[in-house]
Amino acid sequence: PRYIEFEKDKPVTPDQTIRIRMDVVDEIQKLAELANRYNLHVSLNLHRAPGYCVNAGFNEPFNLWKDVAAQEAFYFHWKMWAERFKNVSPVKVSFDLLNEPSFREDMNDQFSAHGPVPGPVYRKIAMETAQVIRAVTPGRMIIADGNNMGGDVIPELTDLGIHQSCRAYFPHFISHFQAPWVWKDPSKAPMPVWPGIIEGQQFGRAQLEEFYKPWIDLVGQGLGVHCGEGGCWKKTPHPVFLAWFGDILDILTPHSIGYALWNFRGDFGILDSGRSDVDYADWYGHKLDRKLLEILK
């Protein structure tokens, strides 16, 4: 909850979810303006919303998928952002409603069992959010992240004029090897290979093509699709990462599905990724992963 007022050492209360720190909102808007100045499009996304975040860590007071109060707070946030950007061209700023939605049994337990949000529930919330946004800024491009943490196409939204966002994290054995927010005991994560067999399952180019086929079919229906996040955490062996990611890009780019790394600089990034098996090049004092750069070109 980057821009709400709350006490970090206490659970978030329902009323705090709509107490907005306008000074922080100003900072976010200025950042978007700076990006636009350099001809970068900004896709504004709520990584944490009232009643849901893919990463637990703050005590949520309610469940976005079950509680009307949470949904009303969610609409409140998007109305605020719509008003903030109503005079900014949709070419410069789009809205991505919520990062990696899933239905988690316990919103406050990172390792709680989870699965897809029921389609009618996702449709209701996405449709009502879009109505709130379009009442203020009618031409705004709206994007919904794939169901089940970004992995699944959402057929329930295809008639709503809402585009969809997939992920480049399949299989998670590759992308999140030993990541502590995924593995309770990172030492038990199986060693990734590409292509090859992991935990008794075959993974390779054919499995990737099968995974992305529904997304490619969605493009064929005339809807926009982008891969809003992707990459590997720093513990994945670099040759495995490059071979796997090269296959993903070979599958997505012929179908005009753009993509983004989770971060530009950091553990998933092209700069300062902190890997132990990369011969970095110096780039203005930063450590550049040149082999990854070549793939991205």
Residue ranges of predicted features:
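Aromatic-lined substrate-binding rim segments of carbohydrate-active enzymes
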Residues: 1-53, 122-137, 241-255
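Short, solvent-exposed turn/loop segments enriched in Gly/Ser/Thr/Pro and often Arg
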Residues: 1-2, 46-52, 98, 146-148, ...
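Surface-exposed, active-site-proximal loop segments in enzymatic domains
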Residues: 2-25, 50-69, 105-114, 270-279
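An exposure/low-complexity boundary signal
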Residues: 8, 14-16, 221-236, 240-241
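A generic secondary-structure micro-motif detector
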Residues: 20-21, 119, 205, 237-238
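Conserved Rossmann-like nucleotide-binding pocket used by diverse enzymes
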Residues: 42, 226, 260
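Active-site region of glycoside hydrolase catalytic domains
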Residues: 56, 62-203, 209-232, 254-257
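Aromatic-rich peripheral "rim/lid" segments of glycoside hydrolase catalytic domains that contact
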Residues: 237-297
